Amino acid sequence: MLKVDPKINAISLVILTLIVGSLASSNTGTDSWYQGLVKSDLNPPGYVFGIVWPILYLLMGITIWRTYNTIKNLFYVQLFFNAIWSWLFFSFHLPLISLFDIWLLIFINIKILLILLKQDKFAAFLYAPYIVWLFFASYLNLFIVINN
């Protein structure tokens, strides 16, 4: 059996994180369906998402680099649910299902954060903004579900 250096695995996951982030964020809300939705007054302009997400993906990448063996399995799972949120919401126009997806993301990522707090407090510090953003995104998603 071929043994791969754990650092190569970590680098691969960092690259995968950036690719998934790039693909998911390329599916933006510029279509007429999204434009026609009633959105929260706290909904930021589109360019803010283009600034925030790359920063969050960079912080996630650094976190996974530091803690690869500790959180890799949960991280893969959360990365999957992170990626499908955009498709559920923007492509398939399923805000309620995407809300359940984001709640699942929050649950998984709190679990990851609790693990990180025991293993690497700096990595937990880097990861925490992602969870804060997920709560904010959950609010925005919930607002759309309730008001549309």
Predicted regions and their residues:
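Aromatic-anchored segments of alpha-helical transmembrane domains
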Residues: 17-23, 78-87, 131-138
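Membrane-interface loop-to-helix entry segments
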Residues: 44-58, 93-104
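N-terminal signal-anchor transmembrane alpha helix
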Residues: 2-25
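Membrane-helix boundary connector in multi-pass membrane proteins
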Residues: 89-95, 111-125
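Membrane-interface helix caps and helix-loop-helix hairpins in membrane proteins
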Residues: 87-99, 144-148
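Core segments of transmembrane alpha-helices
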Residues: 53-64, 78-81, 105
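Terminal transmembrane helical module of multi-pass membrane proteins
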Residues: 122-148
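Membrane-interface helix termini and inter-helical loops of multi-pass transporters
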Residues: 28-42, 146-147
